[in-house]
């Protein structure tokens, strides 16, 4: 994980209860940068507006789905597509799962990069940041990354420091 980006993405990870709306809880800088990595290539490669609109809808639906608290057994599909169980491990406070499950759509990407973590039936026990002083409230969280060292808002994962 990138320490500069983490200071903004920490807003998304500050939630202690992951639910369907959590996919929309983001810092504005995080939105700008991450969306740019998707949208600019679509534009440069000349995809039509219709393709872009379909992509945006798919990404929005996937974000909602990945953050829901449904414990549906996805069977073999959980190895093909990001599921709530897979993504909840990305939000876990468990030190062994930090820097895991970065994929947005396809878990095989994490398999390739060695960041895949999906216990058979287990779900994380706790989510959120270790830093209890991380601010609550939308405006405070939008301002916080500009005036605080990212080390102060990281999970306990030493690789981010």
Spell out what each predicted region is:
Residues 32, 52-54, 105:
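Hydrophobic alpha-helical transmembrane segments
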Residues 5, 14-25, 46, 62-161:
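Cytosolic/stromal cytosol-facing helical appendages immediately following the last transmembrane segment
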Residues 23-40, 49:
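Membrane-interface loop-to-helix entry segments
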Residues 35-44, 60-64:
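Alpha-helical transmembrane segments of multipass membrane proteins
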Residues 44-52:
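Transmembrane helix interruption/hinge and helix-loop junction motifs
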Residues 1, 53, 77:
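Membrane-embedded alpha-helical segments that form the functional core of polytopic membrane enzymes
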Residues 1-11:
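Juxtamembrane helix-loop transition segments at the membrane interface in multi-pass membrane proteins
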């Amino acid at each position: 994980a990138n320490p500069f980006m983490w200071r903004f993405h920490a807003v998304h990870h500050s939630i202690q209860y992951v639910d369907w709306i959590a996919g929309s809880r983001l810092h504005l800088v995080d939105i700008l940068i991450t969306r740019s990595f998707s949208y600019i290539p679509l534009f440069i490669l000349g995809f039509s507006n219709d393709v872009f609109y379909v992509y945006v809808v798919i990404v929005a639906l996937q974000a909602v789905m990945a953050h829901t608290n449904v414990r549906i057994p996805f069977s073999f599909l959980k190895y093909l597509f990001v599921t709530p169980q897979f993504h909840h491990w990305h939000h876990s406070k468990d030190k062994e799962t930090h820097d895991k499950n970065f994929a947005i759509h396809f878990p095989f990407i994490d398999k390739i990069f060695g960041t895949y973590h999906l216990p058979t039936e287990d779900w994380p026990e706790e989510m959120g940041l270790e830093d209890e002083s991380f601010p609550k409230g939308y405006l405070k969280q939008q301002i916080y990354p500009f005036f605080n060292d990212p080390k102060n808002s990281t999970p306990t994962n030493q690789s981010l420091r």
